[in-house]
Amino acid sequence: MKHLFIINPAAGIKDRSRQYIEEIERVFADLDEPYEIALTEYPRHATEIARAHAAAGAPLRIYSVGGDGTLGEVLAGCYGYRNVELAAYPSGTGNDFIKVFPGLPFGDLAALVHGKSETIDILRYNDGVCINIVN
C-alpha cells in the first residue's frame, strides 16, 4: 500500500512541515513501502491532492497532517473511493476530531503507519461531506 502525507504548513501556530517531513523519512527509512509527501499551497489544495491520488485506484492510505480543516479537505477529496484509508496526524490548533478518541495514538506516526484502519461514520450535507465539523 502506498502512503500519502498531505501536510498543511498553515495549520497550527507555526509552520512545522520540515519537522514532519523529517519524522516521516525517519519512520519509512527501514520500511519497504512507498510513500509520498505533498504540501498544500492554497485553500482546498488538500482536496485536489487527495482526489488525484485516490482516482488512481491503487490501495492508498492518506495522512492528513494538519487540523480539523485540513482533515475535512482531505476527506472531501477521497470520499467515495474504496481504495483509500484516511488517517489523522494532528498538527492544528484545535484538533477536535481526535479528542473524541482518547487514548488512541494519533500523535505517534509509527503507530499510525503500522496501525489497522477502522470504518467510521461520515456526515453528508448538501453537496459536501464532513468528519466532525461543517465548514
In which residue ranges do the predicted regions lie?
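Short Gly/Thr/Asp-enriched flexible loops that form oxyanion-binding sites at enzyme active sites
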Residues: 70-82
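Catalytic core of DAGKc-family lipid kinases
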Residues: 40, 80-135
